[in-house]
């Protein structure tokens, strides 16, 4: 075994199966790239990203853990979000929630 190695069963693995998802169109209106990590509360991302922010409350990017999506200046792209799990409480980030969703 290699440190950090993950051994899985053969076959296809579905991430976030059975969880609510949401598709949004996101535009970077700023003059600098914005990168958003896999577990960042999307409602609280950089204000230069323009999208239906209220709809994104309680969601994160539906991508593999440890990865990110980069939005270049002026770029518009469609992303899929997945509902946060666990206690559904959010603390930190930009401090816009600081408690249960």
Curated annotation (Swiss-Prot):
Gene Ontology molecular function terms on file: urease activity
Pathway(s) of this molecule: Nitrogen metabolism; urea degradation; CO(2) and NH(3) from urea (urease route): step 1/1
Gene Ontology cellular component terms for the protein in this record: urease complex
GO process terms (BP): urea catabolic process
Protein family: Belongs to the urease beta subunit family.
Listed EC numbers: 3.5.1.5
Catalysed reaction equations from the record: urea + 2 H2O + H(+) = hydrogencarbonate + 2 NH4(+)
Keyword entries, A-Z: Cytoplasm, Hydrolase
Repeat as UniProt keyword: no
Quaternary structure and interacting proteins, as annotated: Heterotrimer of UreA (gamma), UreB (beta) and UreC (alpha) subunits. Three heterotrimers associate to form the active enzyme.
Name of the protein in question: Urease subunit beta
Residue intervals passing through the bilayer: none
Species: Burkholderia lata (strain ATCC 17760 / DSM 23089 / LMG 22485 / NCIMB 9086 / R18194 / 383)
Subcellular location: Cytoplasm
Gene: ureB
């Amino acid at each position: 075994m290699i440190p950090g190695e993950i051994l899985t069963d053969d076959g296809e693995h579905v991430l976030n199966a059975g969880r609510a998802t949401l598709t949004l169109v996101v535009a970077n209106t700023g003059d600098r790239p914005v990168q958003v990590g896999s577990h960042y509360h999307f409602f609280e991302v950089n204000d230069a990203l323009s999208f239906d922010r209220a709809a994104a409350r309680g969601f994160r990017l539906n991508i593999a853990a440890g990865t990110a999506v980069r939005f270049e200046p002026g770029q518009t792209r469609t992303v899929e979000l997945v509902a946060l799990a666990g206690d559904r409480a959010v603390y930190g980030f930009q401090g816009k929630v600081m408690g249960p969703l």
